[in-house]
Design a protein with these regions (language model features):
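N-terminal charge/polar-biased segments
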Residues: 1-16, 117, 244-263
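Soluble N-terminal domains of membrane-associated systems
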Residues: 1-102
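Cytosolic regulatory modules rich in charged/polar residues
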Residues: 35, 106-120, 172-173, 198-203
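Alpha-helical transmembrane segments and their cytosolic membrane-interface
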Residues: 79-146, 235-244
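C-terminal ends of transmembrane helices
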Residues: 110-114, 157-170, 215-228
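Core alpha-helical transmembrane segments of integral membrane proteins
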Residues: 119-198
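Generic detector of multi-pass transmembrane helix bundles and their immediately adjacent loops
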Residues: 191-263
């Protein structure tokens, strides 16, 4: 093995550190577990002979150092989305690096490609929202008419969420307003179709529920990472509260204006 690979120069070590941090950031911001991010970064550091590498990952940040702390980096990861295609691409790259079949230049190119993997197209997300909400309405005991109302609400709110994402609106506002929009559309749709609105509302709200955040929080707790688990659980609870606020506002206003309790 080349001694330059075993003992990289200072410039090379900084380049390796930048690559590893970018890989960890890509994993974290696209929905990977905290434990997996740390593990992947450590594997890459060992393979590229970045000695005395230490990393600490939270749900919204990465802290890492190498050597006797002469190389240290901090990355803030405020935005967390879910793109398992990117996570899978980085994991595949990590396995190939561990097997010794990828150079640093190749790894950097592969990582750049992984970070450019696009999200599903808007039309796909609209269709997924429409079909998913209809199925949830049926699962929760709704009728075909309830499912149709839920499908319409799912289509509209999926488009609304895409618009909010483009405008970079805050997550809290997005969830409250989306929940309110869902409730309003379901009430109107079910009124037109002469069916109860509760199953349609519940089925459509499922696309807003923080299932991933809640599950990841529990997994972090189980793995002993209590700080990251607490952050994820609080995030999930805040999203749930936002959904409840948006839904409750519309239901209360509807009851106040019409004198009829929506069921």
């Amino acid at each position: 093995m080349d001694s330059r690979e075993l003992y990289p120069s200072d410039e090379q070590r900084r380049r390796i550190m930048d690559f590893i941090m970018a890989a960890g950031e890509t994993l974290l911001e696209n929905g990977a577990e905290v434990f997996r991010v740390e593990q992947t970064m450590e594997i890459m550091a060992r393979r590229f002979h970045l000695r005395e590498f230490h990393v600490y990952v939270l749900t919204n940040g990465i802290f890492a150092s190498a050597g006797t702390a002469e190389i240290a980096e901090v990355r803030n990861v405020p935005v967390r989305t879910t793109h398992l295609g990117r996570v899978a691409a980085v994991n595949a790259l990590s396995r190939e690096i561990a097997a010794g079949g990828v150079t640093l230049n190749e790894a950097e190119c592969r990582l750049a490609e992984a970070r450019r993997i696009p999200f599903p197209k808007g039309k796909t997300q609209l269709l997924a929202g429409m079909s998913g909400t209809a199925c949830f309405a049926l699962i929760f005991g709704g009728t075909i008419r309830s499912a149709l109302a839920a499908a319409a609400a799912g289509f509209i709110v999926s488009g609304y969420l895409l618009l909010c994402e483009e405008r970079r609106l805050s997550n809290g506002f997005r969830k409250i307003s989306a929940a309110a929009l869902i409730t309003l559309v379901c009430i109107l749709g079910c009124h037109l179709l002469d069916t109860e609105a509760s199953h349609a509302i519940i089925g459509t709200l499922m696309i807003l529920t923080p299932g991933i955040a809640f599950t990841m929080g529990i997994r972090d707790f189980v793995q002993g990472d209590y700080l990251s688990g607490t952050i994820r659980m609080i995030d999930a609870l805040l999203i749930a509260a936002s959904i409840a606020i948006g839904t409750g506002l519309v239901l209360s206003l509807t009851s106040l204006l019409t004198g009829v309790t929506v069921v």
